[in-house]
Amino acid sequence: MESIREEFRDIEDKSIVLFIPSITEYHQSIPDILDLLVNERDLNCVYVTINKSYRRLNDLFSKKGINTGSIFFVDTVSKGLGFDSNDGDFFLLADPRNLSGLSITIAKAVKRSNGRFLIFDSLSSLNLYNSVSRISKFFHALTAEIRSWNIGAIVISMDEEFKEELINTFSGFCDKTIKRV
């Protein structure tokens, strides 16, 4: 099996990729992908996190040698933990059930950061807060917006969270699907 870096090396900067990692590869693959996009390709990225705080991710990525100054975070975790600031290189969103608010916040982050690439971590985490039908509509709208912004994206989804039929639907909105399970 190819390494994560090899699989993503040929991805065009304006492609939308659905990435379905194995649970064991999930934690290592994200820093590898960011190293490729941020450090090698010198792209500003918007990182949408549904299940981890931006502080935790920022620390992790810094320790892995990733230029976190090129990453703007949209965090749906920290505001619920009592943090209430949108200063600097992040936006906090109170509720991952508010998909309209999430879309608006992502659009603001792309504009504010001059983001050239979006990483959405993860579509399957939205399943904890929203119905599959709402997630599917959100994903369809998000991919249309990404194309209108003329940027690329990697949308992460864990394999066991959605039925194969829904994964196939999600794949239809993307340019490529990379499944490593």
Locate predicted features.
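Glycine-rich P-loop/Walker A and Walker A-like loops and their local beta1-loop-alpha1 context
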Residues: M1-L60
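Substrate-engagement module of ASCE P-loop NTPases
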Residues: I135-E161
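Short, aromatic/basic amphipathic alpha-helical patches
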Residues: I33-L34, L57-I66, E165-G172
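Phosphate-binding/switch region of NTP-binding enzymes
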Residues: I151, M158-V181
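Structural motif
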Residues: L18, F117-F120, I154
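Long, charge-dense
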Residues: F61-R97
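Short beta-alpha junction loops
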Residues: I50-Y54, V77-G80, I151-F162
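Phosphate-binding/switch loop-helix module in NTP-utilizing enzymes
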Residues: G82-A141
